[in-house]
Amino acid sequence: MSGLIGKKIGMTSIFDENGKNIPCTVIEAGPCVVTQVRTNEVDGYEALQLGFDDKNEKHSTKAALGHFKKAGTVAKKKVVEFQDFATEQKLGDLIDVSIFEEGEFVDVQGVSKGKGFQGVVKRHGFGGVGQATHGQHNRLRAPGSVGASSYPSRVFKGMRMAGRMGGDNVKVQNLRVLKVVAEKNLLVVKGCIPGHKNSYVIIQK
């Protein structure tokens, strides 16, 4: 499985050869530096650790600076491991957006936008308790009953209630690559991906 670390630029739309308007997301994908090579002999599994987006050295620990120095690179803001990388890579190698091709499908993982504390209507899509008139008072967006009284005399685990919404790790699978702009390290994928603008995402194929 190959992949890159990227940054969400934003959404736009393009026209295909049939004149159909397709919504798409632009991602700044790489270039990423190989900061560590995991091997079965030393680590018990095989993986590549990639670093993305330069970081100011004064915001890094000495241990982190020493780790990146071994790879011959500056400190990075985002570091991710990719297991079973498709191609053989060495420490310090640069991997760019050219590993992707137009027309293939990728998975994109990111942290969804945080919405704060939300009620059950927005968070879970509840319909409320019915009509807004005929004696109904202040219950339109209420969750309703969460369980019986004498038995089971408790609330079941997983009961959908109000709470903090968003800020979760979300993966969107099988997004088609519409365009690869190698000279600008841009990847254009069909549809939307999780996260706000300039948030980090992981692109896998």
From Swiss-Prot:
Xref: PROSITE patterns: RIBOSOMAL_L3 (PS00474)
GO cellular component: ribonucleoprotein complex; ribosome
Signal peptide bounds: none
GO biological process per UniProt: translation
Alphabetical list of Gene3D superfamilies matching this protein: 3.30.160.810, Translation factors
Origin superkingdom: Bacteria
Molecular-function annotations in GO: rRNA binding; structural constituent of ribosome
InterPro entries linked: Ribosomal_uL3, Ribosomal_uL3_bac/org-type, Ribosomal_uL3_CS, Transl_B-barrel_sf
Pfam families: Ribosomal_L3
This protein's UniProt keywords: Ribonucleoprotein, Ribosomal protein, RNA-binding, rRNA-binding
Role played: One of the primary rRNA binding proteins, it binds directly near the 3'-end of the 23S rRNA, where it nucleates assembly of the 50S subunit.
NCBIfam families: L3_bact
HAMAP family linked to this entry: Ribosomal_uL3_B
Similarity comment: Belongs to the universal ribosomal protein uL3 family.
Quaternary data: Part of the 50S ribosomal subunit. Forms a cluster with proteins L14 and L19.
Name of the featured protein: Large ribosomal subunit protein uL3
Organism whose genome encodes this protein: Flavobacterium johnsoniae (strain ATCC 17061 / DSM 2064 / JCM 8514 / BCRC 14874 / CCUG 350202 / NBRC 14942 / NCIMB 11054 / UW101) (Cytophaga johnsonae)
Gene behind the chain: rplC
